[in-house]
Curated annotation (Swiss-Prot):
InterPro entries (UniProt xref): NIFK_FHA_Ki67-binding (IPR021043), Nucleotide-bd_a/b_plait_sf (IPR012677), RBD_domain_sf (IPR035979), RRM_dom (IPR000504)
Domain RRM: residue ranges: 45-123
Molecular function GO terms recorded: RNA binding
The name this protein goes by in its record: MKI67 FHA domain-interacting nucleolar phosphoprotein
Record note on disruption phenotype: Embryos have various defects including smaller heads and eyes.
CDD domains, sorted: RRM_NIFK_like (cd12307)
Origin superkingdom: Eukaryota
Location(s) in or outside the cell: Nucleus, Nucleolus
Organism the protein comes from: Danio rerio
Chief location of this protein within or outside the cell: nucleus
């Protein structure tokens, strides 16, 4: 508060050390005051900052770098698709000497488990549109194409899309025919389900309709269509005798079967 009040007061009159030379001294002071002020203008310096940790955006970066000097503009590079930070940005300081000091101090500085990379960009390499839109706040992308694609489509929308596709396909076929290209392909028309014939569509399936009656003529017609099985059984049945458990029984059974075969041969003779 005291500094502000003192600055508002007019500057005190300068006095010469020798009172006799005060008149000549005041003339020289007025001449110096009338001279045009040729103060040195500060040239801004642009600083590249890379390997930024997550969660460090424009407000945090500006508040951090303002401890070195006045920050004119700042920009964090973001993705147009997701809106997230790409991990690098640009800071413009009022004085290029301050930018050099910041680059020497912050280069290879560990911040948020990442090593920050900083270097000063030469003025001739700074693009004129580097900081365009840096003052305006970041706006999240709206994704109009994604919302339009994911919305629920009505039957009218599906019909409109189908008609557009068919019209494009017909124009393509005409262009191919005009160029003399004989090329046939199913196209979108094959994917659209065909409409039923009006005769089939008008057939009523109501339960109130009259059901057909089983008349004798209908029953006879059904009987004639049936295939009757043959009464004669031509199947061949082979009977196999069970084998006896003991070996003696096996020999006896073999002898009996041999005798039976001989008897059959004699009868046949």
């Amino acid at each position: 508060m005291t500094e502000g009040k003192s600055s508002d007061k007019p500057a005190k009159r300068l006095l010469a050390l020798n009172p006799k030379e005060d008149a000549e001294f005041q003339k020289k002071v007025q001449q110096v005051k009338k001279r045009p002020q040729t103060g040195q203008t500060l040239s801004p310096g642009v600083l590249y900052v890379g390997h930024l940790p997550r969660g460090l955006f424009e407000p945090q970066l500006k508040s951090y770098f303002e401890q070195f000097g006045k920050v004119l503009r700042l920009r964090v590079s973001r993705s147009k698709k997701t809106g997230g930070s790409k991990g690098y940005g640009f800071v413009e300081f009022e004085c290029d000497e301050v930018a050099k000091i910041v680059a020497e101090t912050m280069n290879n500085y560990l911040m948020g488990e990442r090593i920050i990379k900083c270097h000063v960009i030469p003025p001739e390499k700074v693009h004129e549109k580097l900081f365009v839109g840096s003052i305006a706040g970041f706006k999240k992308p709206k994704y109009p194409a994604v919302t339009r694609y994911n919305k629920t489509h009505t039957e009218d929308d599906v019909k409109k899309v189908g008609t557009k596709l068919l019209s494009k396909e017909s124009k393509l076929r005409k262009r191919l025919a005009a160029k003399g290209i004989d090329y046939d392909f199913p196209g979108f028309a094959a994917q659209i389900p065909a409409k039923k014939a009006p005769s089939e569509a008008n057939v009523s399936v109501c339960s109130e309709d009259v059901t057909p009656v089983c008349t004798p003529s209908l029953l006879e017609r059904r009987k004639s269509l049936r295939v009757e099985d043959d009464d004669v059984d031509d199947e061949i049945v082979i009977k196999v005798k069970p084998l006896p458990e003991n070996s003696d029984d096996v020999e006896e059974s073999e002898e009996e079967s041999a005798e039976e075969d001989e008897g059959e041969e004699e009868e046949a003779a």
